[in-house]
């Protein structure tokens, strides 16, 4: 039995191949189940992500785009011919419908302006699931940031309230200290000393 060529990329097993081989060996997955799942997936997404259908749609849109561009190049002359039909040069459209053709040209211009946006939307369809996942992650992070911001705002309000209380107490404390200093009143070092002790010291 010939050894596998180490320089051949096809001979080197990848992670997906090893996992799939393990599932097949354990009996959890077999060839028929894989084929059925692939056929179901291909059937569900054939008209959206299959290259054949995408190529057909892009080709049709490109053909329409080329046709409308060619029409727009003659927009001025077409408008004049529709509004003022001349002998042997007017389009084979009844005169009562000429104004509708002018409106149709305006719609065509609008469609061509938005064509690139529509094509970009079609190209992004295969990446829609990944984009939705990223959007959900961004929304979750935004919710966390909103919660943290609310908590920070509450803390700021509490801190401001405490600062206001401290600021309102400072003049009262200064007035008491000034009064005590003016009358030579010595406050006891212990906070729970009775007023009688203070009066005794003052009497001395």
Curated annotation (Swiss-Prot):
Record the organism: Pongo abelii (Sumatran orangutan)
Subunit composition and interactions: Component of the HAUS augmin-like complex. The complex interacts with the gamma-tubulin ring complex and this interaction is required for spindle assembly. Interacts with EML3 (phosphorylated form).
Q: Which gene encodes it?
A: HAUS2
**Name listed for the protein in its UniProt record:** HAUS augmin-like complex subunit 2
Establish whether keyword Metal-binding is in the entry.
no
Which regions form coiled coils?
Answer: 54-84
Q: According to its UniProt record, where is this protein located?
A: Cytoplasm, Cytoskeleton, Microtubule organizing center, Centrosome; Cytoplasm, Cytoskeleton, Spindle
Any one GO biological process:
centrosome cycle
Signal peptide feature range: none
Listed transmembrane segments: none
Q: Report the Pfam families cross-referenced here.
A: HAUS2
């Amino acid at each position: 039995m010939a050894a596998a060529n180490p320089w051949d990329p096809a001979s080197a097993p990848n992670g997906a191949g090893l996992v799939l081989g393990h599932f097949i060996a354990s009996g959890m997955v077999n060839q028929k189940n894989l084929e059925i799942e692939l056929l179901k997936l291909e059937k569900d997404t054939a008209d959206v992500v299959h290259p054949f259908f995408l190529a057909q749609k892009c080709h049709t849109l490109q053909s329409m785009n080329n046709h409308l561009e060619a029409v727009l190049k003659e927009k001025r002359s077409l408008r004049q011919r529709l509004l003022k039909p001349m002998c042997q040069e007017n389009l084979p459209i009844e005169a009562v419908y000429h104004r509708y053709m002018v409106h149709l040209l305006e719609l065509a211009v609008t469609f061509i302006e938005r064509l690139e946006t529509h094509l970009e939307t079609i190209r992004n369809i295969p990446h829609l699931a990944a984009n939705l996942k990223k959007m959900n992650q961004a929304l979750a992070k935004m919710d966390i940031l909103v919660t943290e911001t609310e908590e920070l705002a509450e803390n700021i309000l509490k801190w401001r309230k405490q600062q206001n209380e401290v600021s309102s107490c400072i003049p009262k404390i200064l007035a008491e200290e000034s009064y005590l200093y003016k009358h030579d009143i010595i406050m006891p070092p212990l906070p729970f000393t009775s007023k009688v002790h203070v009066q005794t010291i003052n009497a001395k």
